């Protein structure tokens, strides 16, 4: 990993010149070490869910990763955990509760999986202060409209807790990925606060449509627009004007630490988007997330 990837100046210069207090990153990963080690090993193997070489830029010890984000000026971040099998989510939530308690700038994160008892540990997480959930439809290989999740979605809708959901078919499609299951889900739970990870890559236009249709559906920029992603899943030129129109619903995300480039590229890739101005950047990097997660200036 190049030392330049850890230089905060290219990142801090951007948000300072925009006149915002810092960055809110809704898509970062902190997990129990054995889980993170397995995730990194999978990336190293370029497994079928990834489909290409994927070097991890910020493969450092946990406290160093937290310190790196703070040096970049990230005021709030998440510990996006996700279960890929039954009887995993509850103990991940326990770990994330402890992590949030010792890391006050991390939004308390939780997850769930379609299984008996999911409603109970989701309720416990909300009562413990969870401010965001994460589910990964591709890795979890489950349908978001699984009947076991009906009470969970209902609870999350009523509690108005955001859910970062990886439901697009990138970097490789899964049995349950794509926009159609999300459309079905939102017909039943139209007030769900979904944050569509990776702008819904590669079904960008479909998920922009969904966000435009439902007031509480947002998108995060995670890995979108970067050179790495544009090689396989370029954002359609025809959709650029919609980024401006929906700028109030777009949140910055990075996928730190599991990115194959420096953190600064996740920010600079946004600056050069057609039609984007400084006000759009202020909204995406800070103001939209601050409003959603009730962060004081």
Put a short name on every predicted segment.
Residues 88-94, 117-120, 142-152:
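Active-site-adjacent beta->alpha loops and helix N-cap segments on the catalytic face
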Residues 59-69, 91, 114-125:
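Short, acidic/polar
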Residues 23-26, 78-80, 109-110, 134, ...:
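Active-site neighborhood of phospho(di)ester-bond hydrolases with catalytic His/Asp-centered motifs
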């Amino acid at each position: 990993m190049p030392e330049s990837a850890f230089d905060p100046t290219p990142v801090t210069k951007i948000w300072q010149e925009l006149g915002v207090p810092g960055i809110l990153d809704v898509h970062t990963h902190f997990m129990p070490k054995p889980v993170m080690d397995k995730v990194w090993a999978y990336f190293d193997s370029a497994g079928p869910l990834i489909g290409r070489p994927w070097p991890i830029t910020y493969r450092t010890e946990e406290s160093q990763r937290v310190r790196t984000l703070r040096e970049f000026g990230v005021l709030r971040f998440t510990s996006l955990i996700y279960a890929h099998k039954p009887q995993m989510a509850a103990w991940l939530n326990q770990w994330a509760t402890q992590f949030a308690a010792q890391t006050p700038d991390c939004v308390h994160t939780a997850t769930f999986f379609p299984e008996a008892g999911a409603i109970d540990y989701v309720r416990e997480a909300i009562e413990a202060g969870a401010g965001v959930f994460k589910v990964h439809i591709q890795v979890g290989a489950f349908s978001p409209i699984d009947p076991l999740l009906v009470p969970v979605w209902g609870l999350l809708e009523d509690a108005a807790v955001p859910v970062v959901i990886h439901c697009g078919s990138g970097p490789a499609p899964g049995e349950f990925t794509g926009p159609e299951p999300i459309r079905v889900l939102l017909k039943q739970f139209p007030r769900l606060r979904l944050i569509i990870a990776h702008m819904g890559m590669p079904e960008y236009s479909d998920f922009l449509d969904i966000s435009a249709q439902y007031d509480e559906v947002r998108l995060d920029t995670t890995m979108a627009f970067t050179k790495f992603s544009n090689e396989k899943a370029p954002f359609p030129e025809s959709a650029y004007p919609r980024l401006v129109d929906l700028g109030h619903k777009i949140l910055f995300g990075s996928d730190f630490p599991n990115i194959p480039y420096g953190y600064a590229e996740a920010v600079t890739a946004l600056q050069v988007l057609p039609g984007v101005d400084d006000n759009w950047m202020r909204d995406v990097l800070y103001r939209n997330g601050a409003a959603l997660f009730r962060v004081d200036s």
